[in-house]
Amino acid sequence: MFHKKAQVIVGITTFYDEFLGLSVPGLARLENDFILVIYNDNPNTIVKKRQIRQLGYRGGLYVINGGYNKGQLGARLAILDFVRRHKLKSDWFVFCDDDDVLTGLNVPDVSQYNFAIIQNMLVVRTRLIDVLRLMRDSGNCVIDNENVCQVRPHVGLAGTLVRYSAIMRMADVLNSVLQNIYEIDESLSFRPPVDMMMWSALNIIARHDNKMATPIYMDVANYIATDIDTCSTKYGMKLQPTKNATQQFQRAIARYDVAVRIALANENATPVGQELNA
């Protein structure tokens, strides 16, 4: 597959800034030219540019320290809002979690109808040495499905290159139904599946705007997820449902999807009174 030079923005949200010691050095090793935007969602800490430079990153950099905890969705939307307000130029955008490693930013020459580029993800489950090896050389690993496994393809927003116009359009729609989304979040007994929800919303919105829109799959690994210190709870909430996790996640995503579809339907609704002037 042919590649083309493209402008890319990488967005990272962080709560425990120590995790940036994983994600930022990984980005520093990339040969691609890109802009990094970091949103610190922990009001009790301050992340400084100097801290990021000490981790080896030398490219374009913006650091946002939030005044209060927004959560993952709010932090991601805050990054997109910052990018828009500061008119940062880009063709593509990709999110990366602070405790994961982005190992590739190559953009293939794809159709205008391809709004996202899906790739593969490596998941390190048990050994820190595997994380360090993969950070040095993402091709130097043994996928044994015990210590390291491969998700092929990786379907989600983190690690997926998305066209700038598509992700900004998604941000507009999600901001319009933010209250509905938070109400669904509060009704769940587990941590909201933000990445899955945003990916589903992106697909719904892109295909609503253009029926020809579709993601494209590139069969290479570009993302390393660390699952070593995953605990049963985070921020006071269970990471996964205790029972029937798949079904509960699917039901939650279906509820988020309804909110997105209603927002899109309301965009197309004729304001009261205007139909008389038609």
Where are these regions (language model features)?
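Short, well-formed alpha-helical segments that are part of the catalytic scaffolds
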Residues: 16-30
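Short beta-strand/loop segment that forms part of the nucleotide-sugar
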Residues: 33-44, 64-67
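Glycine-rich, basic loop-to-helix element that forms the pyrophosphate-binding segment
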Residues: 67-83
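Short beta-strand-to-loop acidic/aromatic patch adjacent to the donor-nucleotide binding site
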Residues: 90-101
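Acidic donor-binding/catalytic loop of UDP-sugar-dependent glycosyltransferases
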Residues: 100-111
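Short beta-strand-to-loop element that shapes/binds the nucleotide-sugar donor at the catalytic cleft/hinge
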Residues: 116-132
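A recurrent flexible, glycine/aromatic-enriched loop bordering the glycosyltransferase active site
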Residues: 141-162
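C-terminal catalytic/acceptor-binding lobe
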Residues: 183-278
